[in-house]
Amino acid sequence: MAKAKGNREKIKLVSSANTGHFYTTEKNKRNMPEKMEIKKFDPVIRQHVMYKEAKIK
Protein backbone atom coordinates (compact mmCIF):
# COMPACT_ATOMS: atom_id res chain seq x y z
CA MET A 1 0.00 0.00 0.00
CA ALA A 2 1.18 3.49 -0.81
CA LYS A 3 2.00 5.81 2.04
CA ALA A 4 -0.03 9.03 2.34
CA LYS A 5 1.80 12.22 1.47
CA GLY A 6 2.65 14.16 4.62
CA ASN A 7 1.78 17.72 5.56
CA ARG A 8 5.39 18.77 6.04
CA GLU A 9 7.13 20.80 3.37
CA LYS A 10 10.81 21.72 3.09
CA ILE A 11 11.58 25.42 3.23
CA LYS A 12 14.63 27.67 3.17
CA LEU A 13 15.15 30.42 5.76
CA VAL A 14 17.09 33.30 4.16
CA SER A 15 18.95 35.95 6.15
CA SER A 16 17.47 39.46 6.03
CA ALA A 17 21.01 40.91 6.34
CA ASN A 18 21.64 40.06 2.62
CA THR A 19 24.69 37.92 3.40
CA GLY A 20 23.50 34.98 1.31
CA HIS A 21 23.39 32.68 4.34
CA PHE A 22 20.39 30.38 4.75
CA TYR A 23 19.08 27.50 6.85
CA THR A 24 16.88 24.66 5.61
CA THR A 25 14.06 23.23 7.69
CA GLU A 26 10.59 21.73 7.47
CA LYS A 27 7.25 23.12 8.53
CA ASN A 28 3.75 21.73 8.78
CA LYS A 29 1.74 23.67 6.20
CA ARG A 30 -1.58 22.74 7.81
CA ASN A 31 -0.71 24.10 11.29
CA MET A 32 1.30 27.10 10.04
CA PRO A 33 0.03 28.35 6.65
CA GLU A 34 1.62 31.81 6.97
CA LYS A 35 5.24 32.57 6.05
CA MET A 36 7.73 31.81 8.81
CA GLU A 37 9.92 34.55 10.32
CA ILE A 38 12.38 33.63 13.04
CA LYS A 39 15.42 35.23 14.63
CA LYS A 40 18.54 33.09 14.18
CA PHE A 41 22.31 33.48 14.21
CA ASP A 42 24.02 34.61 10.99
CA PRO A 43 27.66 33.38 11.13
CA VAL A 44 28.74 35.66 8.26
CA ILE A 45 28.18 38.85 10.29
CA ARG A 46 28.20 37.05 13.68
CA GLN A 47 24.88 38.51 14.85
CA HIS A 48 21.31 37.36 15.39
CA VAL A 49 19.08 38.58 12.54
CA MET A 50 15.62 37.86 11.16
CA TYR A 51 15.35 34.95 8.75
CA LYS A 52 12.41 34.80 6.34
CA GLU A 53 10.92 31.81 4.57
CA ALA A 54 11.66 31.17 0.89
CA LYS A 55 10.90 28.24 -1.39
CA ILE A 56 13.58 25.66 -2.14
CA LYS A 57 14.19 25.58 -5.89
UniProtKB/Swiss-Prot annotation:
Domain of life: Bacteria
Cellular compartments per GO CC: cytosolic large ribosomal subunit
Gene Ontology BP, a term: translation
Family matches, as PROSITE patterns: RIBOSOMAL_L33
Keyword Protein transport found: no
A GO MF term: structural constituent of ribosome
This protein's UniProt keywords: Ribonucleoprotein, Ribosomal protein
NCBIfam families xref list: PRK00595.1, rpmG_bact
Family: Belongs to the bacterial ribosomal protein bL33 family.
Protein's name in the database: Large ribosomal subunit protein bL33
Species assigned in the record: Shewanella pealeana (strain ATCC 700345 / ANG-SQ1)
Lineage: Bacteria, Pseudomonadati, Pseudomonadota, Gammaproteobacteria, Alteromonadales
Gene name linked to the record: rpmG
